[in-house]
Regions:
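Short amphipathic alpha-helices and their capping/turn segments at secondary-structure boundaries
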Residues: 2-16
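Conserved core of the sugar-phosphate nucleotidyltransferase
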Residues: 97, 101, 123-190
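Residue-level signal for alpha-helix termini/capping positions
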Residues: 52, 107-108, 139
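N-terminal glycine-rich phosphate-binding loop and ensuing alpha1 helix
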Residues: 13-63
Length: 190
């Protein structure tokens, strides 16, 4: 019995789900980053492979504006049903708009999904067990969404900025004398 069939029988996959991997071609900081080689494979290949290996998704889709990225994505098993329009491919377009565009495209093509997962093309260390664990937590919690996070390596309550006068100014001066272990733990999205 295949892993996918076994998971469906266990109740993990009772609804339709899609994975959307946004991958713009015009990165300014690291040009062509989504297809740069990382340990012998294009960076985006790792995200596609982990999505496929998890067996959580009915479709793994790459939303891109770039023909070369599209070609690489298809080579590694993703679906690229369109090239993203220019107005959704600039430096100011957020992930939400890209995901919504893809979901609208799918809906207009007669496909609707109960669950949508976004994996960034720049996540080569993501492990499928965390995708499965996150999906199970989402389904069992009744929440509308879930995301990965990590604890901050230091207390954010002790952070400061450098003023225009080149002086340190704490964001929360009331915490200056507190011990770091007495401050509440904070998290950031990962």
């Amino acid at each position: 019995m295949s892993t996918e069939v076994a998971k469906k029988q266990e109740g993990i996959l009772q609804n339709k789900s899609v994975c959307i991997i946004p991958a713009r071609g015009g990165s300014k900081r690291i040009p062509r980053k989504n297809i740069k080689l990382f340990h012998g494979k294009p960076l985006i290949a790792y995200s596609i492979e982990v999505a496929l290996k998890s067996n959580l998704f009915d479709k793994v889709i790459v939303s891109t504006d770039d023909e070369e990225i599209a070609k690489v994505a298809i080579e590694y098993g993703a679906i690229v049903p369109f090239l993203r329009p220019k107005e959704l491919s600039d430096d100011f377009t957020g992930t939400g708009a890209v995901v919504n565009h893809t979901l609208e495209y799918l809906k207009n093509s007669g496909e609707e999904f109960d669950y949508c997962c976004t994996i960034y093309a720049t996540a080569p260390l993501l492990n499928e067990k965390y995708l499965i664990e996150g999906f199970e937590k989402l389904k069992n919690s009744g929440a509308k969404n879930a995301f990965s996070c990590t604890s901050m390596p230091f207390p954010i309550q002790r952070t400061f900025k450098i003023t225009t006068e080149q002086r340190c100014e704490m964001f929360w001066p009331e915490n200056f004398m507190k011990r770091s272990q007495d401050l509440e733990e904070a998290y950031q999205d990962a």
